[in-house]
């Protein structure tokens, strides 16, 4: 729906999907959440993984819904209200959203980034680089949605399908010409990006996560691969050092394919990488020439992220020289290998690492940043993949000198049981302190000034989820308070 234009009618939204007697009914907004319904809105009642929208049709009407599209079978009596039943409504939600928001992805270039780790960093570094190249780039993802510097809060890595198209429409109104979107496996499996005309798809890596949802790595990889089957794609950027990425690349049309990695078969091949405390240098071979890339980022794992962004810029039509220049101007992403370096204090690293592979990578990088001991403070999220908990505990035992197990976002699980799952994979030398602030304070108090403390799992987050309530909490703010720093 264009701002200032006439409202869209229900008939326009459902044309070719279902017939009903309400074609001329004006629709002023749309939502999948009955709590967000406003006067004149259309409510889509869809059965989800945890909640069935059909249970909330009455609440939607009480809040002012003008009509309801409901997945069959409808669970409420229609009486005189406008309830339109549609078989497999979720399959049409993307089309309906596109019609309401006037096909926003037709008017803006969309880059989708998927993978277990690196999505946020790649999207934000890519957006920064594109801005340096004269674009107005926005992001949709974990840290927030919108143009950089003015992000709106986002509760999901990839929003629901209606919100995705709404965000794209907002990006257009903010004069963005490129959107860098994190695309989670959940989003792909649940059709949350249906109808989005992606121009470029990027694959970073695949390692264990979300098996509470996907059950096995085969299903997890299959969900990720859906992004690369979208017909609007002009380029596919794939890390072929990753086993699944290598397999995925073989399914892509050669004219669309841009590969990167240390592999000799990579179109952008890494030859050399040098990592310093706040700086990365990569020598790579592109089109027969050796190119030197520099970026002001910490951590060896960011070599792959920078290479992904460089390759994406090439795939989007920028020269290697322009891509190199743009990456020089990028800055670290909040909560991703974020360093807090205070004279006379232990070096603190805040990172979002919440998978075994990510924790392994970050701890290995932390070891190279200090001559002292490495401490790690972390927990695991509740209501999430339980299988990774002992694995993360094992990683911490192997790679850190001291480990303090604490709360992450316990949600509806008992924190002490989550901690026990983590400790099951450990060597018995760990400490457990479930109060996250106290755990951080304990590490800061006991670490030497030459030591390093990794606070992992929450990164940029500013609240802590206890299921029935959330409380304000920021790892960065806690460290600043304990170090008596000005925010």
Residues covered by each model-derived region:
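Receiver (REC) domain switch/active-site residues of two-component response regulators
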Residues: 66, 199, 401
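N-terminal leader/targeting and accessory segments in enzymes
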Residues: 1-95, 243, 266-274, 298, ...
């Amino acid at each position: 729906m264009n701002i200032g234009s006439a409202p869209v009618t229900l008939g326009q939204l459902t044309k070719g999907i279902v017939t009903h007697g309400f074609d001329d009914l004006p629709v002023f907004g749309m939502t999948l959440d009955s709590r967000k319904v406003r006067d004149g809105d259309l409510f889509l009642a869809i059965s989800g993984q945890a909640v069935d929208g059909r249970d909330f049709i009455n609440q939607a009407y009480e809040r002012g819904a003008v009509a309801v599209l409901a997945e069959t079978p409808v669970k409420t009596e229609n009486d005189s209200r406008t309830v339109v039943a549609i078989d497999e409504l979720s399959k049409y939600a993307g089309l309906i959203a596109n019609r309401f928001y006037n096909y926003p992805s037709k008017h803006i270039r969309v880059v989708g980034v998927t993978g277990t780790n690196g999505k946020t960093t790649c999207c934000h570094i890519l957006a920064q680089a594109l801005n340096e190249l004269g674009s107005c780039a926005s992001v949709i993802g974990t840290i927030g949605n919108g143009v950089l510097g003015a992000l709106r809060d986002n509760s999901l890595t990839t929003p629901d399908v209606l919100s995705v198209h709404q965000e794209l429409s907002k990006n257009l109104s903010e004069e963005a010409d490129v959107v860098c979107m994190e695309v989670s496996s959940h989003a792909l499996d649940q059709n949350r990006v249906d109808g989005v005309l992606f121009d470029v798809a990027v694959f970073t890596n695949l390692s264990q996560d979300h098996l509470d949802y996907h059950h096995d790595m085969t299903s997890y990889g299959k969900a990720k691969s859906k992004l690369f089957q979208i017909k609007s794609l002009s380029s596919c950027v794939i890390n072929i050092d990753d086993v699944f990425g290598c397999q995925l690349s073989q399914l892509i049309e050669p004219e669309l394919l841009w590969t990167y990695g240390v592999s000799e078969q990579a179109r952008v091949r890494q030859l050399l990488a040098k990592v310093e405390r706040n700086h990365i240098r990569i020598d790579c071979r592109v089109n027969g020439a050796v190119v030197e890339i520099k970026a002001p980022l910490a951590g060896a794992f960011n070599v792959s992220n920078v290479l992904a962004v460089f390759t994406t810029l090439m795939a989007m039509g920028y020269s290697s020289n322009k891509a190199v220049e743009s990456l020089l101007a990028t800055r670290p992403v909040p909560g991703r290998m974020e360093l807090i370096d205070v004279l006379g204090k232990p070096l603190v690293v805040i990172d979002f690492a919440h998978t075994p592979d990510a924790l392994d990578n970050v701890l290995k990088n932390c070891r190279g940043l200090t001559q002292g001991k490495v401490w790690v403070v972390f927990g695991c999220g509740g209501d999430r993949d339980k299988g990774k908990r002992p694995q993360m505990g094992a990683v911490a035992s192997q790679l850190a000198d001291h480990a303090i197990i604490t709360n992450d976002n316990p949600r509806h699980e008992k924190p002490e049981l989550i901690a026990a799952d983590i400790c099951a994979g450990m060597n018995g030398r760990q400490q457990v302190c479930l109060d996250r602030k106290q755990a951080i304070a304990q590490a800061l108090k006991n670490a030497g000034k030459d030591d390093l403390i990794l606070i992992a799992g929450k990164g940029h987050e500013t609240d802590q989820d206890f299921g029935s309530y959330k409380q304000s909490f920021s790892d960065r703010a806690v460290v600043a308070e304990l170090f008596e720093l000005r925010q």
